[in-house]
């Protein structure tokens, strides 16, 4: 029997983007779910109310993309979770960095009249 060489292509990894109303957290995992690297808008350098902006989400995504390219994680599946302002900006930051995006999923949970909502904020 022949010994076939394994392909030299980069392994597939998941980029999980969690956007909340206050922050954006991006977590890169392998196929088994083990965390390889992560970043948040706060860890990039945005503090306070600036973490919730779309520019902070884009900067966080660009930092994660640079680290992915450094580790040869080029082929990615993207998973979005949460309701925040930075979804499109984070996707734009990942696309412009040179990653090969294979699939995009949105896993945001939508309640069908589940738990009672928090009361509205009045200013």
Language-model segments: residues:
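Ribosome-associated RNA-binding proteins
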Residues: 1-123
């Amino acid at each position: 029997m022949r010994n076939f060489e394994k392909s030299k292509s980069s392994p597939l990894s998941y980029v999980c983007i969690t956007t909340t109303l206050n922050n954006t957290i991006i977590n890169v995992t392998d196929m088994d779910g083990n965390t390889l690297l992560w970043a948040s808008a706060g860890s990039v350098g945005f503090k306070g109310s600036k973490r919730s902006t779309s520019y902070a989400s884009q900067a966080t995504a660009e930092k994660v993309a640079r680290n992915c390219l450094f580790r040869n994680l080029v082929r990615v599946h993207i998973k979005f979770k949460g309701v925040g302002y930075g979804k499109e900006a984070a996707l734009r930051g990942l696309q412009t960095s040179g990653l090969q995006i294979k699939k995009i999923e949105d896993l945001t949970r939508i309640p069908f009249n589940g738990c009672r909502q928090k009361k509205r904020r009045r200013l």
